[in-house]
């Protein structure tokens, strides 16, 4: 019998240094830590989904044709230019697997979504960091376009990832800067528009003209389907075809495929929810801005990054008052900061009251 195995020695070095992702869950707390849509699904949608004819004893459609046709109508991108995934996390790792690896590298702009670097490390892909720049106000960020183009010129770089609006800062980068990077870098540019429905901005319309452009979107945010893990990539058929070579054959389950296809029929209702959440976040931002001791960063998403004098204390005291937000720890350019997303109108009213009591 084997008593002990050399796990650490057998691990790839890039995995050995990683820490497992941990999602915090505190019972009886209102969750404002994951940038989810807290509002209920539009009336009739759950009934339509549960009444659907889904063969649970059969493998799902590996090509997700019904969902891709619905996405094609929603985005204007042909079905052959769409790839669906088990959440954006799977798609990010698929991108690194396909175009990265030990001989490839990706350019990212910290502070940004942590999964880009995590997926790169797992796949052995090199990471080149070109930090964002603070604007003169000190409350907003911008891309270092020249720095990103310089980094992208290195031969091992195959990809650039731009998160727009950016998580966790909420920054919306100018369209012309993104398209300049697409045009001048010559590398694959992935624009993560997970929060694009809140900003109202997108570069999807440029896909027909840019063979190196990929746009990533999700059903986890505005469409309130975080539990079902459903994301998608948009691009020209050639680059989507390349990614399909490395994709798992049945990567999106039948229930999620059907839910996504049905959700896209409720576009008007979800757009209204987006307006509600944007207005609710504005109330929270206004309340935070009223405190001179709090730095509030500009946002075009459904969340806001802010910096009180003692972030750890504010975080813990909010938990004590029934609210779980995200403690971002030490962020590049920022330092210790907190992030919270808009909740329901009722929860936001209670949150603003709690913040007032803590920050006074």
UniProtKB/Swiss-Prot annotation:
Q: Name one GO biological process term.
A: L-histidine biosynthetic process
Provide this UniProt record's keywords sorted from A to Z.
Amino-acid biosynthesis, Aminotransferase, Histidine biosynthesis, Pyridoxal phosphate, Transferase
Q: Hey, which pathway is this one from?
A: Amino-acid biosynthesis; L-histidine biosynthesis; L-histidine from 5-phospho-alpha-D-ribose 1-diphosphate: step 7/9
Originating gene: hisC
This protein is called: Histidinol-phosphate aminotransferase
Q: Which family does it belong to?
A: Belongs to the class-II pyridoxal-phosphate-dependent aminotransferase family. Histidinol-phosphate aminotransferase subfamily.
Root EC class: transferase
Reaction equations catalysed: L-histidinol phosphate + 2-oxoglutarate = 3-(imidazol-4-yl)-2-oxopropyl phosphate + L-glutamate
Q: How does it assemble?
A: Homodimer.
EC number(s) from the headed UniProt entry: 2.6.1.9
The transmembrane residues are none
- Per the record, residues carrying N6-(pyridoxal phosphate)lysine are 221
Among NCBIfam families, the record links this protein to:
hisC
Co-factor(s): pyridoxal 5'-phosphate
Identify a single GO molecular function assigned to this protein.
pyridoxal phosphate binding
Q: Which domain of life is it from?
A: Bacteria
